[in-house]
Amino acid sequence: MLPPGPTGKVRADGARQKFLRGATAMQELIEPMITGQPYPIKGLVLYGTNLFHTVPNLPRTKAALQKLDFILSIDVLPQDHIPWSDVVLPEATYLERYDDLWACGHKTPYIALREPAIEPLYQTKPGWWMARELGRRLGLEAFFPWQTAEGYLNQRLSSIGLDLDQLRKQGGVVIQKGKPYLADFEATGASPFNTPSKKVELYSKALAGAGFKPLPEYEPSAEPPAGFFRLLYGRSPVHTFARTQNTPVLHELQPENAVWVNEAAAYRLGLKGGERVWLENQDGARSGPIAVKATPRIRPDCVYMVHGFGHDAPGLSRAHGKGASDAKLQTRYALDPISGGAGLRVNFVKLIRET
């Protein structure tokens, strides 16, 4: 049994306090770092994230980092924010470490094991080891009662009468018999809906009581200014967020992104497929150059690009300078007052031919 953690402190990002729903609101940490309200933030630990491709308004994010006394980064790659760090702890890759059990309860429940194929190379360490050692040095050893990753995993597996050896004998995956989602609710007579009425609520009294509109109302977005397009972004089946663009095999499959432009709009601008342009948003932020993909598969008032490209980190030798970064062009965002979520498709760009 772990000891209770600290309680009572107001969350600086407003999650579950300023915002009625939402586990975290990362972009809302930026202003408290700068203003010191509701309390000063002096240090930041960045684990497995490319900060400059994650949080909107990059200039504001950099201003926040300049206010901090200490930045610790833990990663497997020399990401764009790494040069801003005071200390960098290189983590072992997924092939060199244990990770937590992957447990899914869906139609076919299963438990899967990820264990190292080789020992960690160079001076890298697994993330669990870093957390435990840092906790021990801070006098928090009671929160880390396990000496090894195997000990922790065996403790978890013991709740269902398994251990690592048994799991390995089954190929690293335990598949259990599933059951219909509603079976447990039907057996007890309970409702599957976690609402005050235990029914589907189209009208929310909880939202009304908190001062929000109890029924969703459509709020139109601003239209693009003359000469601009709404910036849309999305994912690629080849890459994972902004983390895999430097991976040799994946880089070979998709070395850079392209900007989708409606073919009629491209014709009007005198642009041809494959021609390279810079993107400049409504606040003057730029990214590129990026190749044009003229296509009928997008609205005439929008452009689209795959997220995760346009890296500035020299250590990312393959990805460095390839394509454009949608994150650099997201200097504005719309804040959802209920969840704290950030709507990022409220930025507009114009296309400037590369000279």
Give the positions of each predicted feature.
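Extended redox/cofactor-interaction regions of prokaryotic respiratory oxidoreductases
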Residues: 1-83, 93-103, 109, 173-269, ...
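Catalytic alpha/beta core of large soluble enzyme barrels
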Residues: 89-90
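Long, contiguous, secondary-structure-rich segments that constitute the structural scaffold
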Residues: 117, 121, 125-172, 244-260, ...
